[in-house]
């Protein structure tokens, strides 16, 4: 994610374009990746990039360190990487580079794919091709001691205005974005069905939960400036990640936040305590006068007088 051209947004952008190009997607998730990595295969992959014997020795010892169970029982580790280990994600990515990436290049020529950690997508021309690839994936991962997650691995039809095949699954989630058919407008203002990415339902639910956790209505000892300083860094982060594609998906988050700010006004000022409409109008006037105060207000998500 820190390499140029390899960020999550790069992966989303590439996936969007491929979904427009290919009608079918095979999405897969590896079940318990970190617990099931084969040590011998991992060390073989590592030796392709490192010849320093003492370093290889330390990595191998670190992989095999015993686990102390809750009851004090010592259990030998025969596979997997230590939970929470700082280099576990790096080693897992190296492992999958050879187990999946190189395998796909060799065995699936011409098939576009994208993998981010243990989540991956392969784009197909037809349903029979997608079914064959899903079967090949299942066999490949079993070959190296891994298993694709049965509940998170599917074939998806990328439905839009020009694709009207009836299929039971027409959406998937990747890197916090839901890819699904959405209503869009063209340059003439005409509505049409498009297959695109937007903040996932799970991500929106999590953002709303964060807003609820802030308990803004109970912070009536704070000024509105203090609230803005407290939450703006988080709002900026949400928008910079999820607002990159289909910004409209975030409108429910911003509306939810405005409702909490309105409740804050009602708790802070007695004259508005039982008058939600008046509290909303008061907040709307502040938004007009100080559009820069809250990050989402700058984006145009303000209350109306």
Task: List each model region and its residues.
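Short acidic (Asp/Glu) and glycine-rich catalytic loops that position anionic groups and cofactors
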Residues: 24, 38-40, 72-75, 116, ...
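A conserved non-catalytic segment of reverse transcriptases
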Residues: 64, 144-219
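A glycine-rich phosphate-binding loop feature that marks nucleotide/adenosyl-phosphate handling sites
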Residues: 116, 153-161, 231-234, 252-258, ...
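Non-catalytic, peripheral interaction segments enriched in hydrophobic/basic residues
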Residues: 227-272
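Flexible, glycine/threonine-enriched loop-and-boundary segments that flank and lead into catalytic domains
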Residues: 105, 157-165, 296, 300-304
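Extended C-terminal regions of large enzymes
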Residues: 256, 260, 265, 269-305
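Residue-level recognition of alpha-helical structural elements
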Residues: 8, 220, 224, 246-250
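Conserved polymerase palm-domain catalytic core
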Residues: 1-159, 171
């Amino acid at each position: 994610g820190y390499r140029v051209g390899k960020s999550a947004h790069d992966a989303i952008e590439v996936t969007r374009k491929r979904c427009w190009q290919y009608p079918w997607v095979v999405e897969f998730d590896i079940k318990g990746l970190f617990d099931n990595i084969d040590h011998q295969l991992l060390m073989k992959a590592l030796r392709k990039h490192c010849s320093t014997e003492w370093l290889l020795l330390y990595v191998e010892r670190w992989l095999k360190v015993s686990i102390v169970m809750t009851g004090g029982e010592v259990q030998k580790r025969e596979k997997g990487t230590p939970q929470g280990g700082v280099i576990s994600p790096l080693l897992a990515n190296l492992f999958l580079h050879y187990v999946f990436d190189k395998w796909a290049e060799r065995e699936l020529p011409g098939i576009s794919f994208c993998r981010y950690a243990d989540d991956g997508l392969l784009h197909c021309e037809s349903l029979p091709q997608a079914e064959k690839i899903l079967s090949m994936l299942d066999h490949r991962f079993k070959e190296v001691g891994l298993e694709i997650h049965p509940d998170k691995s599917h074939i998806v039809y990328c439905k839009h205005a020009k694709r009207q095949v009836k299929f039971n699954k027409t959406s998937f989630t990747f890197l916090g974005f839901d890819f699904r058919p959405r209503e869009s407008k063209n340059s003439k203002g005409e509505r049409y069905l498009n297959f695109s990415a937007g903040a996932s339902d799970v991500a929106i639910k999590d953002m709303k939960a964060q807003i609820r956790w802030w308990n803004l209505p109970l912070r009536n000892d704070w000024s509105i400036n203090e609230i803005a300083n407290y939450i703006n860094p988080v709002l900026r982060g949400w928008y910079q990640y999820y607002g990159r594609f289909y910004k409209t998906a975030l409108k429910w988050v911003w509306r939810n936040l405005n409702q909490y700010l309105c409740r804050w006004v009602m708790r802070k000022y007695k004259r508005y305590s039982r008058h939600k409409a008046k509290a909303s109008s008061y907040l709307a006037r502040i938004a007009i006068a100080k559009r820069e105060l809250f990050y989402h207000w700058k984006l145009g998500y303000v209350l109306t007088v």
